[in-house]
């Protein structure tokens, strides 16, 4: 047990000594580099860099970057597959109704675009029904709207 503790202490001491030696070496290299750099070298490098950039390069670079950014933006999909009122629809992405129109199905993926769905027609959301009430995938009569006979 004592030998294990002694080995651990020995390892810690060697690690600490190696870290101290690397710190000293890096400090020496930093001092040497700062001594080698003179005051006249720094302004010359800045002057050379500013001479290389002309005024006409910047707008071209900015224009190219904005064009590239515009290409990377998510585009709003154009509704080239949407159908108008009275046309064929299938409730799929390729044959959907435009705007607020709803597809009234007559069979399996076979329907017509209409303003709203009549009573007892197949629906998914209440907003599709004229009565604004969809229950168990069928448009239902709205009990709150009563027809008063004349």
Swiss-Prot record:
A GO CC annotation given for this chain: extracellular region
Glycan-bearing residues: 20, 24, 32, 36, 48, 52, 64, 110
Keywords assigned: Disulfide bond, Glycoprotein, Knottin, Secreted, Signal
Annotated Acidic residues bias: 36-49
Residue span of region Disordered: 22-49
Coiled coil: none
Protein's cellular compartments: Secreted
Signal peptide (UniProt feature, chain positions): 1-18
Disulfide bridge positions per record: 116-130, 123-134, 129-139
UniProt keyword Signal present: yes
Domain of life: Eukaryota
Similarity field: Belongs to the UPF0506 family.
Description of its domains: The presence of a 'disulfide through disulfide knot' structurally defines this protein as a knottin.
Protein name in UniProt: UPF0506 protein SJCHGC02381
Organism from which the protein derives: Schistosoma japonicum
Organism lineage string: Eukaryota, Metazoa, Spiralia, Lophotrochozoa, Platyhelminthes
């Amino acid at each position: 047990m004592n030998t294990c503790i002694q080995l651990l202490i020995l390892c810690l001491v060697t690690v600490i000594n190696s870290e101290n030696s690397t710190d000293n070496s890096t400090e020496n290299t930093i001092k040497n580099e700062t001594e080698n750099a003179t005051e006249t070298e720094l302004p010359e490098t800045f002057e050379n860099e500013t001479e290389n950039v002309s005024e006409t390069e910047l707008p071209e670079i900015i224009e190219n970057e904005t064009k590239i950014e515009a290409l990377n933006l998510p585009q709003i999909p154009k509704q080239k597959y949407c159908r108008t009122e009275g046309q064929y629809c299938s409730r799929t992405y390729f044959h959907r109704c435009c705007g607020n129109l709803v597809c009234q199905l007559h069979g399996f993926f076979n329907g017509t675009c209409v303003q709203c769905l009549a009573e007892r027609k197949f629906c998914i959301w209440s907003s599709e029904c004229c009565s604004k009430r969809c229950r168990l995938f069928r448009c239902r009569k709205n009990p709150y709207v009563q027809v008063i006979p004349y």
